[in-house]
């Protein structure tokens, strides 16, 4: 079963078995504007929750992408390097940034549900 959760830093995490796929939310890509460059983490890199591990640059600004959970990067989405505009078109689907194995599966459950994330956005 696939579940999706969200961070207050505007990343989404889709958990499928033991693999977590991470990307930025539609809200984040909308705030950034047209994305022109993406820097992805290296495969095999261990990241801590809250650690800056990727960069997304737009015509407006550059922003760090934070690891919403601790774990090891197992794959980066190389398609984003060739077509960073995918982030704008497919923020919460095909434009994932990286996949990782989690250090602690229970930490996933502590992230925001879709309803909680929408409520959080309403406070911004």
UniProtKB/Swiss-Prot annotation:
Domain of life (superkingdom): Bacteria
Cellular component annotations (GO), alphabetically ordered: cytosol; glycine cleavage complex
Segments passing through the bilayer: none
Comment on bound cofactor: Binds 1 lipoyl cofactor covalently.
Cofactor: (R)-lipoate
Disulphide connectivity of cysteines: none
One family name in Pfam for this protein: GCV_H
Entry-linked InterPro entries: 2-oxoA_DH_lipoyl-BS, Biotin_lipoyl, GCV_H, GCV_H/Fam206, GCV_H_sub, Single_hybrid_motif
Domain Lipoyl-binding: 19-101
GO BP of this protein: glycine decarboxylation via glycine cleavage system
CDD domains from the UniProt entry: GCS_H
N6-lipoyllysine modifications at: 60
Keywords: Lipoyl
NCBIfam families assigned to the protein according to its UniProt record, in alphabetical order: gcvH, PRK01202.1
Family: Belongs to the GcvH family.
Subunit structure and binding partners: The glycine cleavage system is composed of four proteins: P, T, L and H.
Role this protein plays: The glycine cleavage system catalyzes the degradation of glycine. The H protein shuttles the methylamine group of glycine from the P protein to the T protein.
Protein name: Glycine cleavage system H protein
Gene coding for it: gcvH
